Amino acid sequence: MSFSDLKLFALSSNKELAERVAQEIGIELGKSSVRQFSDGEIQVNIEESIRGKHVFILQSTSSPVNDNLLEILIMVDALKRASAESVNVVMPYYGYARQDRKARAREPITSKLVANMLEVAGVDRLLTIDLHAAQIQGFFDIPVDHLMGAPLIADYFERRGMVGSDYVVVSPDHGGVTRARKLAEFLKTSIAIIDKRRSVDKMNTSEVMNIIGKVEGKTCILIDDMIDTAGTICHAADALAEAGAVEVYASCTHPVLSGPATDNIQKSAIKKLVVLDTIYLPEERLIDKIEQISIAHLLGDAIVRIHEKRPLSPLFDIEKKI
C-alpha cells in the first residue's frame, strides 16, 4: 500500500509514540523542528514540501499544556500556508477537557475555547482517545473520531487470565460507570462503584465514602479515564482492600501523574497500575508499580482508515479487541 500523499509529523509531547505510529503505518516521520526563543516564543519549521499532502500532526496537550497547545496551532497555520490538502490533529490526550461546563458562576468553558482555536487555525479533523467528557465532541463543527482505550486495557488483563467471576471491575466514582461497564463486558466480570465526596475547598482531593457492590474475596480492577495526583484512585484502592478485596489493580487511559502521584501510588494498596502511552512518562515516573502499554497500533490503524476513507467502527467492536 502506497502512502505517498500521507504525512505524519510529531511535535514535542509524544515523539516516541509518533515514531512507533509511523512504523505501524510503514512511513517515515515528516521532517520538522520546534524551537523556543529566549523570551518563550515558539517557532515551528516544516522542513519538506507538503503541498497537496494529507497531513496528520501527533501531539498531546499534556504538561506543559499551553506550550503544547500553541505548538499545534502554529504548526496547523504553517501547514495551511504551505498548501497541505488536509490537516488532521491526532491528540491522544485532550487537555482542558475537565473544564467542559460552568460548575460555578463566571467560570469559562475552556475545552470549548480549545475547540474553537483548533477550528479557527484550520484543523480539518480531530482524532482523540477517551475524552474526559464525551460530549466535548459536540463543541466541534469538524469531524471528531473518538477512540476508546478500554479494549487495550481489557486485552492486557485478559492475556493474564484475569476474567470471570473472581474479578470485579470498579469505577472510582459515579461518572465512570459507563467506562467500567464497558471493561466489565470485555472481561465478563461484575462491577462495583466507589461513592465518594470531593472536597470543595481543595482542588484535586477527594474522600472515599462507600462501596456499592461485592468486592470481598475478589480481585478488583479500578478503571478511570485519567489519573492526575492519584488521590482518588489510591483512596479507592485502599477502601477496596479494607473491604476485603484480595488484590487491587488500577488502570487508566491518560497517566497525567502530576505532583505527588507516584508517591501516592507507591504507598497505596494498588498492586499494578496499567496505563496507556497517550502521555509521555519519563523514567522517574515509571515506577515498578506502573506498566505502560502502547496505543501505536490503534492510532496507526485509525490514521490509515481515515486516509483511505474506511470506517473506524471496527475499532470499537467489543468482540474484536485491538
From Swiss-Prot:
GO-annotated biological processes: 5-phosphoribose 1-diphosphate biosynthetic process; purine nucleotide biosynthetic process; ribonucleoside monophosphate biosynthetic process
Organism name: Streptococcus pneumoniae serotype 4 (strain ATCC BAA-334 / TIGR4)
Entry annotated with the keyword Iron-sulfur: no
InterPro entries registered for this protein in UniProt: PRib_PP_synth_CS, Pribosyltran_N, PRibTrfase_dom, PRTase-like, Rib-P_diPkinase, Rib-P_diPkinase_bac
Residues involved in D-ribose 5-phosphate binding: R198, D224, D228, T229, A230, G231, T232
Gene symbol of the encoding locus: prs1
GO CC annotation: cytoplasm; ribose phosphate diphosphokinase complex
Subunit details: Homohexamer.
Top EC category: transferase
GO molecular function: ATP binding; kinase activity; magnesium ion binding; ribose phosphate diphosphokinase activity
Amino-acid positions noted as binding Mg(2+) 2 in the UniProt annotation, renumbered to this chain: D173
Matches recorded under PANTHER family: RIBOSE-PHOSPHATE DIPHOSPHOKINASE FAMILY MEMBER, RIBOSE-PHOSPHATE PYROPHOSPHOKINASE 1, CHLOROPLASTIC
Cofactor notes: Binds 2 Mg(2+) ions per subunit.
Keywords recorded for this protein, A-Z: ATP-binding, Cytoplasm, Kinase, Magnesium, Metal-binding, Nucleotide biosynthesis, Nucleotide-binding, Transferase
Name recorded for this polypeptide: Ribose-phosphate pyrophosphokinase 1
UniProt keyword DNA damage, yes or no: no
